[in-house]
C-alpha cells in the first residue's frame, strides 16, 4: 500500500481546517470588536487604537520580543508574542500591558475555541 496518499490527505485536511479556523478567527476579531483598537492593515486607520496606543498586528510581529508592564504600572518584563502570551492577553488583559499602551481592554467573553481561532487569525497576519 502506498503510504504517501494517506499522509497527503491528512496534510490537506489539516490545511483546510487551519484555513477554516483563520476565517472563523477573522469573523470573531471583527464581531468581538478587536478591530476597533487593533489595526491589521496599514490602509485601514484605527483611531481608537491610536488613541489607546494599542498593539498593532501588522508586519513581522509574531514570535518577537516586546516589553510589558506586569499589571498596571508594574515592573517591566520582556516577553515573546507567542501562543501562551496571546491567549493570556485575551483572558487577563491587565496581567501584562505592552509598554507605552494604555490599559483599556476589557476581558472578552470568549470560549477557549474562540480565543484559539482569534489567535490563528492574528498569527496569520504576521509576515
Report the location of each language-model feature.
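The canonical Cys-X-X-Cys-His
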Residues: 25, 31-41, 47, 118-122
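Bacterial N-terminal signal peptides
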Residues: 4-14
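Stable alpha-helical elements in mature extracytoplasmic
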Residues: 21-25, 33, 82, 86, ...
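C-terminal capping alpha-helices of c-type cytochrome domains
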Residues: 84, 96, 103-127
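Hydrophobic aliphatic residues
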Residues: 29, 61-62, 90, 94, ...
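Gly/Gly-Pro-rich "capping" loops immediately C-terminal to redox-active cysteine motifs
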Residues: 26, 41-89, 104-110
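Electrostatic cytochrome c docking/interface patches
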Residues: 13-30, 45, 79-80
